UniProtKB/Swiss-Prot annotation:
NCBIfam families found in the cross-reference section: DNA_YbaB_EbfC
Cellular-component GO terms for this entry: bacterial nucleoid; cytosol
Organism: Haemophilus influenzae (strain ATCC 51907 / DSM 11121 / KW20 / Rd)
Keyword Cytoplasm: yes
Similarity comment: family membership: Belongs to the YbaB/EbfC family.
Subunit structure: Homodimer.
Function statement: Binds to DNA and alters its conformation. May be involved in regulation of gene expression, nucleoid organization and DNA protection.
InterPro entries: YbaB-like_sf (IPR036894), YbaB/EbfC (IPR004401)
HAMAP family registered for this protein in UniProt: DNA_YbaB_EbfC
Protein name, as recorded: Nucleoid-associated protein HI_0442
Subcellular location: Cytoplasm, Nucleoid
KW Lipid biosynthesis (keyword) present: no
Amino acid sequence: MFGKGGLGGLMKQAQQMQEKMQKMQEEIAQLEVTGESGAGLVKITINGAHNCRRIDIDPSLMEDDKEMLEDLIAAAFNDAVRRAEELQKEKMASVTAGMPLPPGMKFPF
C-alpha cells in the first residue's frame, strides 16, 4: 500500500521535512526585506515575520501633503510584505522539494 520503505519511511521523511521547515522558518524570521514607493522616496524594511524594522522617508516629502505621504508609506509597506512572502515561498520550496503538497498551500500550516 505504501510502496517501498512503507509507512515508516514516509513518517521519517515527514519528520525530516518538519525539522527542515522549523530551521527555515527561524532563518526567514531573521531576513530583512525592503519595500519602496514613490521611486524610492519612501522605504520600509521588515523582517521575515513582517515586523517593521526601519522606515526611511526622503526629507523632500516632509514638506508635501500628509495624505500623499501616508499613501506612500502604506504602498512601501505592502511592497515589503509582498517581497517577504515571495522570499519565504522560495526558501520553503527548497524544503518541500519532492513532497507532494497542494498548490497554493502557505507555510506555516
